Amino acid sequence: MRIMGLDVGSKTVGVAISDPLGFTAQGLEIIKIDEEKAEFGFTRLEELVKQYQVEQFVIGLPKNMNNTNGPRVDASITYGSHIEHLFGLPVHYQDERLTTVEAERMLIEQADISRGKRKKVIDKLAAQLILQNYLNRNF
């Protein structure tokens, strides 16, 4: 059963996919979106859903450190509602506090990647961490 993890931002959506057994997550790509133009990357998501035979989604919820909803939580839930309606697949939500911070730390400490290159992969790695955290907690 393949699960797709998404890190939804205002300009990009980081995408990750689980292995068929649901043990590990791997970052796939970053989809550019434009909220102001109502371009949400659903066409590309549909291609990936078909390619990987996705059966469910996990979307990161950007909560505040005190467990209240951050400013992007509503946007993430709305995005989840759209993909649930479009694909008819279940959508789960995973607390994503500090995943982007953790992803950036990993890129600096383990890969020694420059700031410019980090911006190109950070959302994909954050999606991977969101999905891996979900897999670790649920399987």
From Swiss-Prot:
InterPro entries assigned to the protein according to its UniProt record, in alphabetical order: RNaseH-like_sf, YqgF, YqgF/RNaseH-like_dom, YqgF/RNaseH-like_dom_sf
Compartments in which it is found: Cytoplasm
GO annotation terms (biological process): rRNA 5'-end processing
GO cellular component: cytosol
Chief localization: cytoplasm
Keyword terms: Cytoplasm, Hydrolase, Nuclease, Ribosome biogenesis
EC code(s) of this entry: 3.1.-.-
Cytoplasm in keyword set: yes
One function term, GO molecular function aspect: nuclease activity
Pfam family, one: RuvX
HAMAP family: Nuclease_YqgF
Similarity remark: Belongs to the YqgF nuclease family.
Function: Could be a nuclease involved in processing of the 5'-end of pre-16S rRNA.
Protein name: Putative pre-16S rRNA nuclease
Species this protein is from: Streptococcus pyogenes serotype M49 (strain NZ131)
